[in-house]
Amino acid sequence: MSGEERMEAYEEKLRSKPTIPTTRISGSGKVHIEGIGEVRVAGAGFVSPEEIDISGSGSLPGGIRVKKVKCSGSISVEGDIEAEDMDFAGSADVEGHVKAGTLSTAGSFSAHGKVKANVMKSAGSSRVSSGIDADDTLRAAGTLRVLGDVKAKNLVDLRGAFQVDGEIVADRFEARLSRHESHVRGGIRARDVDVRRKESEGLVIFGIPILRRFFREGRLYTTSIIAEEKVYLENVSCDNVQGRDVTIGQGCNVRRKVTYSESISVHPTSTLAAPPEKLASVRSGK
């Protein structure tokens, strides 16, 4: 069964919402939800038709659909989960799809299905097996691993190291590279693209940076970067770059073509396989 078929089956299942008894747990305990399974808690928890709040460790059955989920500590979800507001702090592992209005994760987060949210904010380490679809914004700081595509109607903002097996499609794409390599194997398409290296001061003594050259800088590897308007790149290795106003900053390597429609700037430390070509107009194809 494909990822889309699993998501359709999941949404069909959620149309019949189960009854969740209101229960407060202190120490350890469990709550049985008819037709779904059991909520297990070791620590403290509150379970109701509107909200699930767990501190400590616990597990949720697949098919949970409430307004708010908040988990601090270690949590596992044995299938799909949906909430308007979802907040995981610590370690969270979801065996299925995640559907949320706002999804916030801090620590270690893993989803074995697809993540669909209005806004997703991730701090720490996140892994998503079937892609991320954000109606508005995706912000990730730390490490992000996505086995599918990443799509956002507004902004994708990545800070740290990221690995995306598919493509990134957004209105705006921004990245600040850490000292580690990042990869986007399917390319990047957006209205504006801005990729910059993280400033490394090296070892600072009495306010003076020394040994800067011994600290490794991050690099982004991808195929094509296509923007409708502005492109600014640092420490990027790619096949093609296309945009209206294109700035190839320091440390870049473009293996095939750079095309632009209005302005072009190339830093002397960057290498191009061929001189930039001017086009009548460019489109991202989003």
Model feature map: region roles:
Residues 1-286:
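Intrinsically disordered, low-complexity terminal regions
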